[in-house]
């Protein structure tokens, strides 16, 4: 019986042959000769004996008849792989099916070992990751962080070269971390570059990659895609990214991001990633300023789409929103109601295989990524691959990602603006009132938050192929804040014990011109900081909650988890949950950067009636940690209200400011976020 943990070794050193040593314990797969590629079959004994001296563990691989891999092998090993391309999606779907349909872990190991040296390394990583997440007999395996396996997606090529040099020349115990420069993609002449720390943050890009891994939009096994409220989660997670990005823009004296409304306008911003793909051995193509989109006709990618197609799909989606229903493939009306409308729209706009009618409403969001990522070579005349917008692990580095998603969010907001506003009765919690709220950092002034820079080291050795083994560290600079605590004083006058759902949001107080924000603008800038259940005793209550407990974020250790060092004990419920926990907003980016003189924000806290919000289900283990943006593994989303409640709809009539929106179970307080331009080293 194969040990399922050995499957994780197949992620190590993705471009090396499968029979090379892997893992911290020097482990080798005993690959049957018939599984080797033509290049290595004649010399396998020689190579394996060379590796064999140091081996601590051997993994037997059973020889079985291999399913038809022609479709997965149709993508070259040195091509770029993108989930946004329909051809690549079909190829990935086929490989996922093959991995999912293997009867046992033994058979899965055999097929994975056979496929590993024959299919594209990034495709292999994606398909095996999805299969391990969804197969009942492999759930609970901790997938290695994508940044460790493919460091080239996160680090510029100069640093990669220095890391190669370090690992080749210096013995493992003496190696020094290689510092990633802070300003390597542009200079301050480009105002957009002020946001480098957000767009190029390793944790944020890993969150986006991991979210799409947990919520794939295509697979022939529908259950892999059809998770609870995944369309709504697509809307909400990306809406929150835009709200957070806009708060960062205010923290750098920039206006809110403008949506990419007219697809025929030039894209003002250029982007030069300065990264090389180790799989394709090519540089990621840049996009020059004022590039226009063109119709795509790339035979090699089986792509033939016109800008007119995107415009038609957009118009049909708007028409459906204004009519209040969409037409499914059988001609039936599917209502866009308060309960499920946003979920239907999310699957339709993204689009996933759950879309009610892909023929009519198309594939707007995914194709937008494709159009932008091929803007530099729309007909494949220069044989160039896609830019960073074509890959979920790199897309958030590009300023145009936020313009495109603001445009997508505007379509969702059109639907939300047509729903009836929440009434005071829907918002109020009779008998429960908040007396006061305060935020404190250790030893700081009340209601003042502080951010600064921090340098952290991440081990990238799994992704460095054809080099001596041992740790290779990259040191990167990221935003960090002093931890803080919310203190909420509230009264329960109902005379009995009650349960409340505490919802914490924050938004800038003033707009770009320094004017107090109107409620209808401010609601779309609200970033969710936390959401948790609390019991309310009769009479006065004081609730304290630490910022590190947030339902939005995961701790640093989990974003960059070292799978060997801090793995929970084998077989425990905690271990089962460890992997899903890779999805979540990085805790170091919980609050915006702020300004040296302080960014004026308003903190909003609401306690809603948990009886109305509760979902009856068991949540074992710790993986509801980042449920707000990621949901909970194999469970329903743990909140009955719409995502973003109470700010997901326009306010009731007569409410033009946040203060008029409040009911007794809500409270606001002004908070100041100061940025100190100092850099501290993260304690190891």
UniProtKB/Swiss-Prot annotation:
Cu cation A binds at residues 208, 212, 238. It is found in: Secreted. Its cofactor is Cu(2+). Keywords: Copper, Disulfide bond, Glycoprotein, Melanin biosynthesis, Metal-binding, Monooxygenase, Oxidoreductase, Secreted, Zymogen. The keyword Oxidoreductase applies. Upon activation, a trypsin type protease cleaves prophenol oxidase to yield the active enzyme. GO terms for biological process: defense response to fungus; defense response to Gram-positive bacterium; dopamine metabolic process; hemolymph coagulation; melanin biosynthetic process; melanization defense response; melanotic encapsulation of foreign target. Its EC number is 1.14.18.1. Cu cation B binds at residues 365, 369, 405. Binds 2 copper ions per subunit. It catalyses: 2 L-dopa + O2 = 2 L-dopaquinone + 2 H2O; L-tyrosine + O2 = L-dopaquinone + H2O. InterPro entries: Di-copper_centre_dom_sf (IPR008922), Hemocyanin/hexamerin (IPR013788), Hemocyanin/hexamerin_mid_dom (IPR000896), Hemocyanin_C (IPR005203), Hemocyanin_C_sf (IPR037020), Hemocyanin_N (IPR005204), Hemocyanin_N_sf (IPR036697), Ig_E-set (IPR014756). One of its GO terms (cellular component) is extracellular space. Residues 1-50 form a propeptide. The active site is at residue 350. Disulfide bonds join 581-623, 583-630. GO terms for molecular function: catechol oxidase activity; metal ion binding; tyrosinase activity. It comes from the Eukaryota. Glycans are attached at residues 448, 492, 665, 677. Belongs to the tyrosinase family. This is a copper-containing oxidase that functions in the formation of pigments such as melanins and other polyphenolic compounds. Catalyzes the rate-limiting conversions of tyrosine to DOPA, DOPA to DOPA-quinone and possibly 5,6 dihydroxyindole to indole-5'6 quinonee. This is Phenoloxidase 2. It comes from Drosophila melanogaster. The gene is PPO2.
């Amino acid at each position: 019986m194969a040990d399922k943990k050995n499957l994780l070794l197949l992620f190590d050193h993705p471009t090396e042959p499968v029979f090379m040593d892997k893992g911290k314990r020097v482990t080798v797969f005993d690959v049957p000769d018939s599984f080797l590629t033509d290049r290595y079959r004649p010399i396998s004994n020689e190579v394996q004996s060379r590796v064999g001296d140091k081996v601590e563990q051997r993994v037997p691989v059973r020889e079985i008849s291999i399913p038809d891999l022609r479709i997965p092998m149709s993508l070259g090993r040195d091509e770029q792989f993108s989930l946004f391309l329909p051809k690549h999606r079909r190829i990935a779907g086929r490989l996922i099916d093959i991995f999912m349909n293997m009867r046992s872990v033994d058979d899965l190991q055999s097929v994975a070992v056979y496929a590993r040296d024959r299919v594209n390394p990034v495709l292999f990583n994606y398909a095996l990751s999805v299969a391990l997440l969804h197969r009942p007999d492999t759930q609970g395996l901790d997938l290695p962080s994508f940044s460790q396996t493919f460091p080239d997606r996160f680090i510029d090529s100069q640093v990669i070269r220095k890391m190669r040099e370090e690992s080749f020349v210096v013995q493992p115990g003496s190696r020094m971390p290689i510092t990633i420069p802070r300003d390597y993609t542009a200079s301050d002449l480009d105002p957009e570059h002020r946001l480098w720390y957000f767009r190029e943050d390793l944790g944020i890009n890993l969150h986006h990659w991991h979210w799409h891994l947990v919520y794939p939009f295509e697979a022939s096994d529908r259950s892999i895609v059809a998770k609870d409220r995944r369309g709504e989660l697509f809307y909400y997670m990306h809406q929150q990214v835009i709200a957070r990005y806009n708060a960062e823009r205010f923290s750098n004296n920039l206006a809110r991001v403008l949506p990419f409304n007219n697809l025929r306008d030039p894209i003002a911003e250029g982007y030069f990633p300065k990264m090389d793909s180790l799989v394709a051995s090519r540089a990621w193509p840049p996009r020059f300023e004022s590039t226009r989109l063109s119709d795509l006709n790339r035979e090699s990618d089986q792509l033939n789409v016109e800008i007119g197609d995107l415009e038609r799909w957009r118009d049909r989606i708007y028409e459906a929103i204004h009519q209040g229903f969409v037409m499914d493939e059988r001609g039936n009306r599917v209502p866009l109601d308060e309960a499920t409308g946003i979920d239907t729209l999310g699957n339709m706009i993204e689009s996933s295989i759950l879309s009610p009618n892909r023929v009519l409403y198309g594939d707007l969001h995914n194709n937008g990524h494709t159009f932008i990522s091929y803007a530099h070579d729309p007909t494949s005349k220069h044989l160039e691959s896609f830019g960073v917008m074509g890959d979920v692990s790199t897309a958030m580095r590009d300023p145009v990602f936020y313009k495109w998603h603001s445009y997508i969010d505007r379509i969702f907001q059109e639907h939300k603006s047509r729903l009836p506003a929440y009434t005071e009765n829907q918002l109020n919690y009779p008998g429960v009132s908040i007396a006061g709220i305060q935020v404190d950092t250790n030893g700081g002034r009340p209601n003042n938050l502080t951010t600064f820079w921090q340098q952290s080291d991440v081990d990238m050795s799994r992704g460095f192929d054809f080099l001596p083994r041992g740790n290779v560290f990259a040191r990167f600079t990221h935003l960090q804040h002093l931890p803080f605590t919310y203190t909420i004083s509230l009264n329960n006058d109902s005379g009995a014990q009650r349960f409340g759902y505490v919802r914490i949001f924050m938004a800038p107080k003033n707009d770009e011109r320094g004017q107090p924000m109107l409620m209808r603008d401010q609601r779309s800038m609200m970033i969710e900081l936390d959401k948790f259940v609390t019991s309310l005793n009769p009479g006065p209550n004081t609730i304290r909650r630490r910022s590190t407990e947030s339902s939005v974020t995961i701790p640093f250790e989990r974003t960059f988890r070292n799978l060997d060092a801090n793995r929970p004990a084998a077989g425990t419920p905690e271990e089962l949950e460890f992997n899903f926990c890779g999805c979540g907003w990085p805790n170091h980016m919980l609050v915006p950067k702020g300004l040296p003189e302080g960014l004026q924000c308003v903190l909003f806290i609401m306690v809603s009636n948990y009886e109305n919000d509760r979902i009856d289900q068991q949540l074992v283990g710790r993986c509801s940690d980042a449920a707000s943006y990621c949901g909970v593994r194999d469970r329903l989303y743990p909140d009955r209200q719409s995502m973003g409640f109470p700010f997901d709809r326009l306010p009731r009539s007569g409410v033009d400011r946040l203060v008029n929106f409040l009911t007794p179970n809500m409270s606001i307080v002004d908070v100041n976020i100061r940025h100190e331009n100092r850099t501290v080293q993260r304690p190891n």
